Amino acid sequence: QTCASRCPRPCNAGLCCSIYGYCGSGNAYCGAGNCRCQCRG
C-alpha cells in the first residue's frame, strides 16, 4: 500500500507511512528518520 501522496492519514489504523512511500509497522516505517507521516507518537 503506497502512501506518500496521501499524507497526513494515508494508512490503515496502526500503520505508519515510511519515507519510501509505503505503509507498514515497525522501526523501518515508524522509527525516527524513517517515518514520513501518520507516525506513532
Swiss-Prot record:
GO annotation, biological process: defense response to fungus; killing of cells of another organism
Superkingdom of origin: Eukaryota
Keyword terms, alphabetized: Antimicrobial, Chitin-binding, Disulfide bond, Fungicide, Plant defense, Pyrrolidone carboxylic acid
Gene3D superfamilies (alphabetical): Endochitinase-like (3.30.60.10)
Disulfide bonds: 3-17, 7-37, 11-23, 16-30, 35-39
KW Nucleus (keyword) present: no
Pyrrolidone carboxylic acid: residues bearing it: 1
GO molecular function: chitin binding
PROSITE patterns (UniProt xref): CHIT_BIND_I_1, CHIT_BIND_I_2
Annotated InterPro entries: Chitin-bd_1, Chitin-binding_1_CS, Endochitinase-like_sf
Domain Chitin-binding type-1: 4-41
Protein task: Has antifungal activity against P.infestans, A.lycopersici, V.dahliae, G.zeae, A.nicotianae, F.moniliforme, F.oxysporum and C.gossypii.
Subunit structure: Monomer.
Protein name: Antifungal peptide 1
